[in-house]
Amino acid sequence: MFKISFKIFENDSVEEMELNGADGYFQFEIDNETYGIFIPEDIDEFSVSVYWWLYYFLKAVLILKTESYVLISDIEKPKIWIELIREENTLKISKVTADKPEGSGAIETKEMPNLIHHYWKDKQVSYEIFKTEVVNKAKLYIEEVRVLNNEANKDILTLESLILEIEG
């Protein structure tokens, strides 16, 4: 099982071209392990970028079509990564610690220095189930933020183009 949950926070003070609803709660669950926070109250201190988490997961789905290894950096935490390893149609997901060397990106396709499986390791889900959940939650997110934003918001268009690339 793989499940993504999110809740967006409205922000009345965003600039016209910025994305209203970019932040909120983001959590995913796999095999009884969860990552992220999802609580009923809206507490800004616990909010993260829902937009970037969905963007990175969509990018990972695309990369895993042709490659077998992806690391997604938790941009809020200094050494935490989510490791995705594809073997045939099985995806193994782990929460790991590793250095984030100068010049490394939020998404990497090679192992980072000093990578350690401190937390949970090799939680399995089929690639198709993972892909479907990521795409469906990204579509739901787009529906929710579209009502708060200009129709031609560049961030919404970026997510839509990634979804089209995955489904195409």
Question: At which residue positions do the language-model features occur?
Answer:
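Enriched - but not universal
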Residues: 55-56, 84, 123
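Short, structured protein-protein interaction patches enriched in aromatics and acidic/basic residues
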Residues: 71-91
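Hydrophobic beta-strand residues in large extracellular and virion-surface proteins
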Residues: 4-6, 28, 82-84, 91-93
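Glycine-rich loops and low-complexity Gly/Arg-rich segments
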Residues: 52-55, 96-98, 108-109
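A residue-identity detector for tryptophan
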Residues: 52-53, 81, 120
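N-terminal low-complexity, intrinsically disordered segments
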Residues: 1-76
